C-alpha cells in the first residue's frame, strides 16, 4: 500500500495575533513544521502548539528561517554562512527545549519561506543550513525539495533527506515553485488540489504551469495552513487520499 506524510506550517501567530487554525490542522496532519521565533511564533504560542501536537501524536519539526519577523521570512537576506549557521542552531535548540517541555521532541528540520527557496540553488547558504543541523543532531532528517543544492549538501554530510511536494503551489517547468508574487502561484479549489495530490502520490508526476509533466519524488505533502480555506483544503486532501487507499502516516 502506498503511504504519504502530511505536513503543515504551524505556530506562526504572535502574541494575540493568530494565523490559521493550528488546532484543527493538527487533527489532519501527521507532521507539524513549528515556527522557531525568527519569522513568526512567540514562546507561549509555540509551547501551546507543541503540547497539542504531543497530545495528538503529531510529529514536531523545526521550521527554521531567516531572521525576518516583519517580512514573515519571505524576503531573501544576504546573510553570511557563519551567521546563518548560528541562527539555525539557535532556532533548533529553542524548539527542542519547548518540544521537550511539551512531552515531545524535534524529529526533523524544514527551512521556511525565502530560505527554503534560496537554498534550492544557493549552495553556500544550503551548506550552512545543513552544517547547522548536523552540529545539533546528525540524526535529524531534513524536509525539502528534491534536486535542490540543499539536499545535495545535506546528503554529502550524511543527513537523511525527505522530499516533499506542495498541495496548493504551482511548479515551473524546471520543477521549482512559482513565486508567490506571480499570478497563479497558489491554487485554491479544494477538489482540484486533492486530486492533484492523489496523482502526485500514485504516479510520481505533477503538471507544470505550461503543461509539462514533471517527475516528482514525494514522501510528504505540504498543506499550507495560512490560506483562507486551509482546513477545507486539508480535509479534502486527506479524504481523497483515504478514498484512494493511501496510508497516511509520518515518514519513517
UniProtKB/Swiss-Prot annotation:
Q: Which family does it belong to?
A: Belongs to the LamB/PxpA family.
**What PANTHER family does the entry give?**
5-OXOPROLINASE SUBUNIT A, UNCHARACTERIZED PROTEIN YBGL-RELATED
| Name of this protein | 5-oxoprolinase subunit A
Record keyword Hydrolase present? yes
UniProtKB keywords: ATP-binding, Hydrolase, Nucleotide-binding
- NCBIfam families associated with the record: PRK05406.1-3 (NF003814), PRK05406.1-5 (NF003816)
User: Can you list the disulfide-bonded cysteine pairs?
Assistant: none
Q: What does this protein do?
A: Catalyzes the cleavage of 5-oxoproline to form L-glutamate coupled to the hydrolysis of ATP to ADP and inorganic phosphate.
Q: Subunit structure, briefly?
A: Forms a complex composed of PxpA, PxpB and PxpC.
| Pfam families hit by this protein | LamB_YcsF
Q: Which domain of life is it from?
A: Bacteria
Against InterPro entries, the record matches this protein to: Glyco_hydro/deAcase_b/a-brl, LamB/YcsF/PxpA-like
| Name of the encoding gene | pxpA
SUPFAM superfamilies referenced in this protein's UniProt entry, alphabetically: Glycoside hydrolase/deacetylase
GO biological process: any one?
A: carbohydrate metabolic process
Keyword Cytoplasm found: no
Catalytic activity reads: 5-oxo-L-proline + ATP + 2 H2O = L-glutamate + ADP + phosphate + H(+)
